[in-house]
């Protein structure tokens, strides 16, 4: 029989489900984690622990609960909180905690700067949306302005799901 794993990384927990080819649930697991608030208006997760570590833990739990062999897993679907901002180095390793979606409001000054430089109407025309605390662009500008040493080392900006789907050497195999 073939199986599919679904994983959802949420603000306060990670959940996994294992379903067989006819859609029956074989196993479910979850793992709580905390949203870090290092300063008022900031919201973060520890990517290696809260995203990657929880992903590994819940997927291993459902495999053990079900006795399904990893080679019988034919599909993997991930959803996660977002949009988040995670700067990584050229090896794919996180350079800081992941900055969460709209609950993190640290980039309000950068939103104002971008609106003044580019113009609200031009941003709306290009993006189809206004800039808000949900937007990643202002958070990247915040990173450049407030953590230049991290920004210089940044090779890519990932989201939480991108961290799961990219496979730097320590993450080569999950199952």
Task: Tell where the protein language model's regions lie, with residue ranges.
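N-terminal glycine/serine-rich phosphate-binding loop of ATP-dependent small-molecule kinases
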Residues: 1-97, 125, 153
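Glycine-rich phosphate-binding loop and adjoining helix at the ATP-binding site
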Residues: 56, 86-141, 145-146
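Structural signal for hydrophobic packing residues in well-ordered secondary-structure cores
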Residues: 59, 63-66, 115-118, 144-151, ...
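NAD(P)-dependent dehydrogenases' Rossmann-like dinucleotide-binding region
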Residues: 156-161
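Single conserved hydrophobic/aromatic residue that forms the stacking wall/gate
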Residues: 165-175
């Amino acid at each position: 029989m073939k199986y599919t794993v679904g994983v959802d990384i949420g603000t306060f927990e990670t959940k996994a489900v294992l379903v067989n080819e006819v859609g029956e649930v074989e196993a479910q697991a979850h793992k709580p984690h905390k949203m870090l608030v290092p300063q008022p208006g900031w919201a973060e997760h520890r990517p290696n622990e809260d995203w990657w570590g929880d992903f590994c833990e819940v997927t291993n739990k459902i495999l053990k609960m079900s006795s399904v062999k990893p080679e019988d897993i034919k599909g993997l679907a991930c959803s996660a909180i977002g949009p988040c901002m995670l700067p990584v180095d050229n090896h794919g390793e996180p350079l800081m905690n992941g900055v969460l979606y709209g609950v993190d409001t640290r980039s309000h000054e950068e939103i104002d700067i971008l609106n003044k430089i580019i113009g609200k109407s031009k941003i709306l025309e290009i993006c189809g949306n206004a800039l808000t605390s949900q937007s990643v662009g202002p958070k990247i500008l915040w990173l450049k302005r407030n953590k230049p040493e991290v920004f210089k080392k940044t090779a890519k900006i990932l989201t939480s799901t991108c961290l799961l789907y990219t496979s730097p050497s320590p993450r080569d195999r999950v199952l």
